[in-house]
Amino acid sequence: MRHRKAGRHLNRDNAHRKAMFKNLAAALFREEEIRTTVPKAKELRRVAEPLITLAKEDTTANRRLAFARLRDKEMVTKLFEELGPHFKERPGGYMRILRCGFRKGDGAPMALVQLVDREEAIAARRETEEDAEETAEA
């Protein structure tokens, strides 16, 4: 019996599940928006949100904890230098899960997982890219 056992198994063993969520979290931090199944999206929230909370305070110890979970230096750097400061004032709820229909092959319910306030970040990034292009042309 699995009474009072938290979390979803998702038909995978423990190592596969950990690797999958590590990769999903890294993809979410890299792209800031991913498409996956609804159960994976809901479970991803339990993995990714604590990492963003950890990134709000940039210390060596927190970077090591994040690296232990992600195993990707590039994503840890982005997490602590971009996402952490971006969500500094937000007390939680860094992700948005939007249902987006069903997968064609097997009918699995799909979801779009986004980081909240993503539009502002994209607009700011576009402005800096445009400024960089203008200075490069001059």
UniProtKB/Swiss-Prot annotation:
Q: Name one GO cellular component term.
A: cytosolic large ribosomal subunit
* One BP annotation, GO: translation
Checking InterPro entries in the record gives:
Ribosomal_bL17, Ribosomal_bL17_CS, Ribosomal_bL17_sf
Q: Which UniProt keywords apply?
A: Ribonucleoprotein, Ribosomal protein
Q: Name one GO molecular function term.
A: structural constituent of ribosome
Domain of life (superkingdom): Bacteria
Task: Give the matching PROSITE patterns.
Answer: RIBOSOMAL_L17 (PS01167)
Similarity comment: Belongs to the bacterial ribosomal protein bL17 family.
How is the subunit organization of this protein annotated in UniProt?
Part of the 50S ribosomal subunit. Contacts protein L32.
Q: NCBIfam families in the record, alphabetically?
A: L17
This chain belongs to the protein called Large ribosomal subunit protein bL17
Source species of the chain: Halorhodospira halophila (strain DSM 244 / SL1)
What lineage, starting at the top, does this entry show? Answer: Bacteria, Pseudomonadati, Pseudomonadota, Gammaproteobacteria, Chromatiales
Gene (UniProt): rplQ
